[in-house]
Amino acid sequence: VKVTAFAVKHGSWKEALGYRFDADGKSIVISGDTRPVDSVVEACNGCDMLVHEVYSGTPTNAEDAAYFSSFHTSAEQLGEIAAKAKPKLLVVWHYVPLRDTNEAKMVEAIHQTFHGAIVVANDLDVISP
């Protein structure tokens, strides 16, 4: 197994990392907690699976909006990232639904720009590339 770490941006944290795992001709990229960054797209070069965190919906106030946009990736932004990265499978995890959304709306928002397969992961799910 080859493991490659790459820098991501998670708000005010000085260091935050994503990871790419390569083994037996398959590759998985895990974003970690991050706002949209090009390093995720670059790490996905030819990847089988992108596992990425996401929030969807509208923050309730300006403070929450600033927090989410600095620390996390919206469903719309994730769609753009996945469209550029072109993973064979997008796995959504660490899903934060805000007040005016649900899982179906989140997937719909991602599919506005990414037209590939999406799995919404739950704790303890086992998903193979």
Place the predicted regions along the sequence by residue.
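Cap/insert and terminal regions of metallo-dependent hydrolase folds
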Residues: 18, 25-27, 35-125
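Conserved Rossmann-like nucleotide-binding pocket used by diverse enzymes
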Residues: 4, 30, 91
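Beta-strand-turn-beta hairpins that frame and shape the catalytic cleft
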Residues: 1-3, 23-28
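Conserved hydrophobic "DFG−1" position in protein kinase catalytic cores
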Residues: 20-21, 129
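Short, well-ordered turn and helix-capping elements at secondary-structure junctions
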Residues: 7-9, 32-34, 38
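A short acidic, often aromatic-flanked loop/helix-cap motif at beta-alpha or helix-coil junctions
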Residues: 11, 125-129
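Metallo-beta-lactamase
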Residues: 1-15, 119
